[in-house]
C-alpha cells in the first residue's frame, strides 16, 4: 500500500540525520524503468553534489543540493529507503520506517553512495520515481498545482471552508481532492 504522509516524514527525518552535509560519491541505477524512466545522465547530475538539506513537500522527498538544484524522490505504492553503513557488509539495514535484519535482494533500483553510508531505493511495484530539478523556479513550478502543506499556516479552517464551499461531489469522489489537500 502507498506510504502515508507521516511515513514519508519519518523517512525524511531519518535521511536528514544520515546524509545532510554529505557528498554523493557515486550513483548506481540498477533499473531505470520506474514510474518515469530515469534518464541516462541522472548519475552524472547527482555525482559529487553535497546534500545541503533533506526536505519534504506532500509525499515527495526533496534532496536540496549545495548548488541549489534538487532531486525529487517519490516512494510510489511500495517504495522503501534502506540506509546501509558501508562497514557492515550489508548484513544490517535500517529502512528508517521498517526494521529488517537484512537488505532485500530483489527490487533495489537506485543506490546513492556516500563515504560512510549507502542509500538504497527498493520498490517491487516500481511506481516511485526520481527526478532531477535544476533550480528553485522549476521546483516551485513542479508543485504549483498542489494545495498547501498540511502542517503549514496556510492549511487552516478558512482554507478548508473555502475549498468545500459549493462542492457537490462526495469527498471520496472528488478527483481534485488529492491536489487541494496534499498528502492524501
Task: For every predicted segment, state its role.
Residues 2-71, 75, 84-87, 91-94, ...:
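Extended, highly charged segments
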Residues 67, 71-183:
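Phosphate/anion-contacting hairpin/loop surfaces
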